[in-house]
């Protein structure tokens, strides 16, 4: 489950910025807006920035968590099952957000959803029982899996 701090939507991001040394109000407002836009959340909540982030839907909380992470310009963003427990509408919103950000950020996404990996990943690291079995580009993985466990999983897609 994505974590939304008990603060307002706006403060969920400004808290991180202040922690990282950004104090000027105009700069905080600008970065907050930009990151919410990058996470494709701003248009949905722009009139509710002072409201509690706890009232957001699961998908909105996930996009808020992504926006919060983007505030500090990470080299790598680690997402663990970013769409688990989300409905299809919010899953699509998260995937579209990640695809839009793909060229600007490096993502490491842990997922059991191979169809999702096929839609959004450039590279696949396939693991089974804690062991890495394959490391390859997405097209090769799905067209010519080299391990039996991968072939078994792909056949059920």
Feature map (PLM): residue ranges:
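C-terminal boundary and immediately downstream tail of ABC-type ATPase nucleotide-binding domains
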Residues: 139-157
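Helical segment within the ABC ATPase nucleotide-binding domain
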Residues: 91-103
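Conserved ABC ATPase "signature" region
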Residues: 26-46
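Catalytic Walker B motif of ABC-type/P-loop ATPase nucleotide-binding domains
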Residues: 77-80
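Conserved catalytic motifs of ABC-family nucleotide-binding domains
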Residues: 73
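Conserved ABC ATPase signature
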Residues: 51-56, 60
């Amino acid at each position: 489950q994505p974590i939304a701090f008990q603060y307002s939507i706006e403060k969920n991001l400004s808290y991180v910025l202040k922690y990282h040394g950004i104090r000027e109000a105009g700069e905080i407002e600008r970065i907050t807006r930009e990151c919410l836009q990058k996470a494709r959340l701003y248009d949905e909540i722009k009139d509710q920035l002072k409201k509690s982030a706890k009232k957001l839907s699961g998908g909105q909380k996930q996009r808020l968590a992504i926006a919060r992470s983007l505030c500090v310009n990470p080299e790598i963003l680690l997402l663990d099952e970013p769409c688990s427990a989300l409905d299809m509408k919010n899953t699509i919103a998260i995937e579209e957000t990640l695809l839009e950000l793909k060229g600007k950020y490096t993502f490491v996404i842990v997922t059991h959803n191979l169809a999702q990996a096929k839609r959004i990943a450039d590279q696949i690291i396939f693991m089974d029982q804690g062991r890495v079995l394959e490391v390859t580009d997405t097209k090769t993985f799905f067209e010519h899996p080299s391990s039996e466990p991968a072939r078994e999983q792909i056949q059920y897609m």
